[in-house]
């Protein structure tokens, strides 16, 4: 069976509530359907399709003849719903001009035959992909499937209504307004509880109708991948199914409906669907829009795109409510109809979020000529959005954020964050600029995110706005890669949502922690618990009021194992008895309030469940290697962005100030600092991008040497650049009027954080000697 092919898995026994008189149907078809009774001895078999939440659909087979029957559901129905006579009419018109639909054969309005109206069409043998990720196909085939689908949609919207003789099939102009009104009424008629988001979304849609609400095209109304039948072997559409919601209206409503999966809320499971991943060969939304517009010969700048996306989610929420309403009445064909009660609200809330977003539906024209490390298409698009967001929202707020911490330096609020940060976070979430660091969530490569990290490095609080701040990024990496399902549910999800923060407890005050095997904090098993005892310091972020969980590295005693197999990582909630925050540690006099400070923490007989252990005993160093690789790339690329900002400040000051009767830049020493800064920035950027590329192509282990090299080179170079910038700015450079003093503290401490330079240099030398030994005949 081909992946996604129709077959036995799509069929089931007829549900009790949908059973009808098969003998009556057979007698009717013998009389009215040509060829149906050709095999007199053959038995009519009937099975019901599992798919479909609205009009029950059945597979009929008599001998070698196969058909599909669609009927109205039994019982009390919502007004103007389930009009299968319209389905039959539009399919007949489309089939007559060669548009890919199943051939409609017979319509019966006599409800005495099987209890409701019904129609019969030919059975089309092909592939239906129930899972939008289309597992089992190559990325190229997957892409071809999506391209063929959107080309078919463009073909539909290019048809002439008059030539189809479908005048009067829909009311015509004013479609969007009618849709909002109709679906509001449909929802209200089916609602079983009050959901404010539905009311708010309905009101927003009615107040933001497109100015041009007079487009009149034939639209499908429920155009999505699992309503398409593809050729058994080719990536070609051979039939479009389920025309129940078709009408004359605005074509962008179909295109938006097809694009829903790009924004589907993570908390809502897509029934019969896998998880959408941008790395899977599925074209981006902008690429599909470009193909659609090219096929129709229209401009790819689509006005009111956010309206149509919001409308689609409003309709989906209304459909979900209708499915659940029919479940309560006992006349729904789906076994999982009860699930729909809980998805109405998140769908409505997603629609509200999309209503506030601004979209560019045009593919960005980015020149990648000469790029050594090429971004993905999505990476290019996200980088453009991040740059715009930084310029429009983050950098203008820098002064306000800085003043907040100056004013609250000695207050109880000093570990909190100004309100503007929360506002910026909500805006970033709405724009889809959230959790960009995690490839499995963002769909970005390490090279993609490295360039984004460079941008966020230009402002000290920018990573936090995008939920890409350390140490949470590393901790989320750990939980994503190594956490159990229970650990992910309890801690990873709220971290990804930005509802809580975390800290990482590794370094200790009583040992040389640059050699991590020295770590003495003990993690001892006691029946179904572990007991933690020890001292930690430089636990970044522990002062944040939202810090709820710590990942602690400690020794699980087993001296029979190698020294790299004696340490483990464990989750410790910050409110666990025995966890005591001792004091904040300053960095060059800065307490780093914004990032939640750096704290000394003592663990005294701290008891946590054994299920809090991550991956297993003795796996601590294994986890550390997986955690630190990406984190070091992020740190180093942010310092590149920081260096760019410092160089900008240096150049601005050098062109503004006069000393000894000439501009500062005219003094050769300053000119040389500027030149040396540019050279250094380009060198460390290339080296860091090479490390990111190695992560993408070789994995963390294959990129070890490059990562160690950037960890030495980047902080060293940038510390010097910031120092030069301070020198050019004079006394102002170390004052609160410029960010340079804070920049220097950040970059200088990076020569210690995640391992001091000397440890990395020793590791680089060892790896280099090993690599050279492979090439030399002499034994080293």
UniProtKB/Swiss-Prot annotation:
Record GO biological process: fatty acid beta-oxidation; fatty acid beta-oxidation using acyl-CoA dehydrogenase
Protein's UniProt keywords contain Acetylation: yes
Coiled coil: none
Name of this chain's protein: Acyl-CoA dehydrogenase family member 11
Catalytic activity: a 2,3-saturated acyl-CoA + oxidized [electron-transfer flavoprotein] + H(+) = a (2E)-enoyl-CoA + reduced [electron-transfer flavoprotein]; docosanoyl-CoA + oxidized [electron-transfer flavoprotein] + H(+) = (2E)-docosenoyl-CoA + reduced [electron-transfer flavoprotein]; tetracosanoyl-CoA + oxidized [electron-transfer flavoprotein] + H(+) = (2E)-tetracosenoyl-CoA + reduced [electron-transfer flavoprotein]; eicosanoyl-CoA + oxidized [electron-transfer flavoprotein] + H(+) = (2E)-eicosenoyl-CoA + reduced [electron-transfer flavoprotein]
Organism of origin: Homo sapiens
Pathway per the UniProt entry: Lipid metabolism; fatty acid beta-oxidation
Binding-site residues, FAD: 504-514, 538-540, 657, 727-731, 756-758
Expressing tissues: Widely expressed with highest levels in brain followed by liver, heart and kidney.
